[in-house]
Amino acid sequence: MLKTTLLFFVTALCEIIGCFLPWLWLKRGASMWWLLPAAASLALFVWLLTLHPAASGRVYAAYGGVYVCTALLWLRVVDGVRLTVYDWCGALIALCGMLIIVVGWGRT
């Protein structure tokens, strides 16, 4: 379970970085060269999703819970936005959904 969650976390970071770098280019005038590491990060994201032994749709659904939490962590650390009680509640619900799916995929 810990290995799966850690892999999902790294996967989410790759996806967020792969989307954030083009955002910097488009919104903040960063160099177009940032698109190269963005593409590499997104390619790594896709590859990491293939490392799970469950069916792809089940992996994507479970990954979503960790992605939500990672995005909120990014919101706090990178964007400097204080999380609200709604953010925390949403993260808890998302993680519960992920946990149910991951526990279930080992039993089917």
UniProtKB/Swiss-Prot annotation:
Predominant cellular place of this UniProt entry's protein: membrane
Subcellular localization, as worded in the UniProt entry: Cell inner membrane
Signal peptide, first to last residue: none
Pfam families: UPF0060
InterPro entries assigned to the protein according to its UniProt record, in alphabetical order: UPF0060 (IPR003844)
Topological category with respect to the lipid bilayer: Multi-pass membrane protein
Topology feature Cytoplasmic, residues: 27-30, 82-84
Membrane topology, Periplasmic segments: 1-5, 52-60, 106-108
Transmembrane stretches, start-end: 6-26, 31-51, 61-81, 85-105
GO (cellular component) term, any one: plasma membrane
Keywords carried by this UniProt record: Cell inner membrane, Cell membrane, Membrane, Transmembrane, Transmembrane helix
PANTHER family the record matches: UPF0060 MEMBRANE PROTEIN YNFA (PTHR36116:SF1)
UniProt record similarity statement: Belongs to the UPF0060 family.
Protein name in UniProt: UPF0060 membrane protein YnfA
